[in-house]
Regions:
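Ligand-binding loop in jelly-roll beta-barrel domains
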Residues: 308, 318-323, 331, 354-357, ...
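Short acidic-glycine-tyrosine-enriched beta hairpin
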Residues: 392-405, 526-549, 553
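ATP-dependent NMP and nucleoside kinases share a basic, alpha-helical "lid"
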Residues: 64, 115-165
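Double-stranded beta-helix
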Residues: 361-388, 423-462, 558-571
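ATP-dependent small-molecule kinase phosphotransfer cores
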Residues: 3-24, 29, 67-126
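Transition-metal
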Residues: 22-25, 29-33, 196-371, 436-475, ...
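Small-molecule kinase domains that catalyze NTP-dependent phosphoryl transfer to phosphate-bearing small molecules
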Residues: 2-7, 134-135, 158-219
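Glycine-rich P-loop/Walker A and Walker A-like loops and their local beta1-loop-alpha1 context
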Residues: 19-63
Length: 571
């Protein structure tokens, strides 16, 4: 093995067992259950998360139901031209960035038509209403069809259009933008209002392999997750700078050219698996945040962030790859004013592994003038010259277990041959690329560069000396034997690292904990009061400790083995 001294046991399919419930698999079995249900109900609504395959549901499920009347609620929407006009301010002309929207599902419908349908619907007949917005029609039973955002993104890449659109071949970044800034926000508002009222919940993430559970099963599962240690289902993606480390450590396909990103700590986009008697039902992990925020986040974090999960862990693999783009993130007031976000993308790079020549670019060199830097970046963007990073940007050697702190406004990127655990605030698409080393994306298009935004947020006082004194390995030994590794005082996340060869006690510090096993083959999380079963984690796995747990033990799985965990929580 090239990068590990032991065989990796990284688990790509973590799940949480939910007792006393079953999952119904396949359209035929689901149809049988719903037909029995329809004997006692007359009007049933199929509410969809945008991205659910309408044709698949119609052909394989609706066609098998004993109903007298079928209504596609989406035929009552406003004309798409009118909707596009409504969204103009939110979608902007930019390829990547939009403005966060506050639409509700009613905004996209002709409410006069909805009212007329509600007045005319014959509740004595067996009637089915389906589509995104079906719950607007009065009903006596509701089935919710859900899908994770990563699956939606994969379907965009395969040609799926946005809701109501015919943009099959449109740039996938623009599809994602419409989803991120408009569709998913609207759908989440609707989900929060209707999911507790559903009778059944259907996982549609795998094509033609639906799985259905009862509402009680779903919410029992969400509650269990919110009171036990758990992991998210990771996903991996290639990139122009991607590396080779994750192939070995995360047990990925060795025939792929590279993997650049791994997301196993982004509840807004990841899933969880709820396991019902051996059947994994995939549920967007954001559902835990929406419906169990106090258990998961804790009162302090919920009061500050609402039903948002504020911490994000992901991997950036450049070992055997290339540099990330030189970039900067917006200051808080900039992301609020320009994009309507609540808080900004402060972050850090924890070096999980590194080759001897690994570096991190961080901050500007002492004496750099704003006008000269921006002029050089603009000339490089036009292709008139190569940007001279040696002249303008600091470059620091990076070794295993270093921690580089990156408050918003600091120019940065990882160089090649580093394996980065990125620990950051959750807003995750607001990266202003300044220079991308002259590369094209995997889609063959120039990668978006946003000097027009970046020039307004670069902090020029973060020069060589300031970075050295404030952002690199600012380690502080703590009384409990841990090491405080960050983050910077401008960032709301605190990180503590623990090395141990025996059982130690850890506290949640009044906040949800997001952790990663950064050293050792495996460790075990144990309950202090017996409330949960021992939970095994393996090297490089990210795991979440809900604030509900308060305190917990962690020990090496193998006796006397040295293990290391980094813990992130909201200060």
């Amino acid at each position: 093995m090239k990068y590990l001294k032991f065989k990796s046991q990284y688990n790509k399919y973590p799940s949480t067992k939910v007792e006393n419930h079953i999952a119904v698999c396949g359209y035929d079995e689901i149809a049988n259950v719903l037909n029995e249900h329809l004997k006692e109900k007359n009007v049933i609504a199929f509410e969809y998360y945008p991205g659910v395959n309408n044709e698949e549901i119609k052909n394989n499920l609706i066609s098998k139901l004993n109903v007298d009347c079928v209504i596609n609620v989406e035929e009552l929407t406003l004309p798409i031209q009118e909707i596009d006009q409504m969204l103009k301010r939110n979608l902007t002309d930019d390829r990547v960035f939009g403005v966060m929207s506050h639409f509700v599902i009613e905004d996209f419908y002709d409410m006069d038509k909805i009212l007329k349908l509600n007045e005319s619907i014959d509740t004595s007949k067996k009637t089915l209403i389906y589509g995104f917005g079906a719950s607007l029609i009065k009903h006596d039973s509701l089935v919710y069809f859900d899908m994770a955002r990563w699956e939606i993104q994969l379907r965009y890449r395969k040609g799926m259009p946005n809701w109501l659109c015919n943009n099959y071949d449109e740039d996938r970044l623009k599809k994602y933008k419409r989803g991120f800034f408009v569709e998913w926000r609207t759908a989440d508002r609707l989900k929060k209002n209707v999911l507790r009222n559903c009778d059944y919940y259907i996982d549609t993430n795998k094509e033609n392999e639906p799985k259905m559970i009862s509402k009680t099963a779903l919410f029992d599962g969400l509650r269990k997750v919110s009171t036990h240690p758990f992991r998210l289902v990771p996903y991996f993606d290639p990139g122009v700078w991607g590396g080779q480390w994750m192939k070995e450590v995360c047990n990925l396909d060795p025939n792929e050219k590279n993997f650049a990103w791994s997301f196993d700590g982004v509840p807004e986009e990841n899933s969880i698996y709820l396991n019902f008697d051996g059947v994994n039902v995939e549920v967007p992990s954001i559902n835990v945040v929406f419906f169990e925020p106090i258990n998961l986040l804790g009162h302090k974090v919920h009061a500050r962030f609402g039903t948002e999960f504020p911490i994000r862990f992901d991997f950036l693999d450049t070992i055997g790859g290339g540099n990330l783009s030189l970039q900067v993130h917006p200051l808080t007031e900039y992301i609020q004013d320009k994009f309507g976000m609540h808080y900004t993308q402060d972050e850090s790079y924890y070096i999980l592994d590194a080759l001897d020549d690994a570096v991190v670019y961080l901050g500007i060199k002492t004496g750099v003038k704003k006008e000269e830097l921006i002029e050089e970046l603009l000339l490089a963007q036009k292709g008139e010259k190569i940007f001279d990073d040696e002249k303008f940007i600091n470059k620091f050697p990076a070794k295993k277990h270093d921690h580089f702190l990156i408050p918003a406004g600091t120019i940065h990127c990882s160089g090649s041959n580093a394996m980065v655990l990125e620990i950051s605030a959750t807003p995750y698409i607001f990266t202003f690329k300044l220079w991308d080393w002259g590369r094209l994306g995997l889609d063959g298009l120039p990668r978006p560069v946003h000097i027009n935004h970046g020039q307004h947020v670069i902090q020029y006082d973060r020069d060589t000396k300031w970075v050295e004194n404030n952002l690199i390995n600012r380690f502080v030994a703590m009384e409990d034997g841990s090491t405080k590794t960050g983050l910077h005082e401008r960032e709301f996340i605190e990180t503590r690292r623990y090395f141990f060869t025996d059982k130690i006690k850890m506290q949640t510090m009044g906040s949800v904990n997001m952790n990663n096993l950064v050293e050792g083959k495996a460790a075990v999380i144990e309950s202090i009061n017996g409330e949960f079963e021992p939970f095994v984690i393996h090297y490089a796995e990210t795991f979440i400790i809900p604030e509900y747990i308060k305190e917990y033990y962690i020990r090496p799985l193998n006796e006397n083995e040295k293990c290391g965990v980094i813990k992130a929580y909201v200060r």
